[in-house]
Amino acid sequence: MEPMSEPFEHWESAWDSPGFVLWHATLRWGAAMRAALAPHDLTHVQFVLLASIGWLVEAGGAPTQRAVADHAGADIAMTSQVVRSLEAKGLVTRERAAGDARSWRLGLTPEGKARLVEALEAVEAADRAFFGAAPDPGSLPSVLRALARRDRSGRIVEG
């Protein structure tokens, strides 16, 4: 069988492809997050939604489940399932929104606040260790923000 040279001519090595490198970095970062969150009995998705609720509550009030999903960049159905699991763990409160029987307002229980603070410290320490290995870790947030704020067509979708 002859090698497929044409499709691979753009990069000298797979490790020169930004997508391939990002994939591997994401795998390693995900493993670091799982290790940091395991002692707190939280999955990464649970942590992200718990933290999003915390951020939005701090910004002013009880966010809707939709607002939390949007903030986290998560699917609304998946958010609903995960929020119910956080509620079952005693970390989150859910109350029907006034005037809309389909909408839920979310908050953190005292245990949820405490768990979030502990988990956030662990995640931030893991982030410092992981991203600190980069040549210029201070530039990473702006680079990642520029990429994360674009939709599939390349348009900027968030501030």
What is each model feature region?
Residues M1-H40, K89, G138, G159:
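N-terminal leader segment of winged-helix/HTH proteins
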Residues P18-L37, L116-D151:
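Hydrophobic alpha-helical core bundles mediating ligand binding, dimerization, or RNAP-core interactions
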Residues L27-D75:
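N-terminal helix-turn-helix DNA-binding core of bacterial DNA-binding proteins
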Residues A51, G60-A74, G99-A101, L116-A119, ...:
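Short, structured secondary-structure boundary patches
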Residues G60, R149-G159:
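Short, charged, intrinsically disordered terminal tails
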Residues Q65, V83-R84:
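Short, hydrophobic-biased segments on the C-terminal half of alpha helices
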Residues R84-S142:
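Charged, amphipathic alpha-helical coiled-coil/dimerization segments
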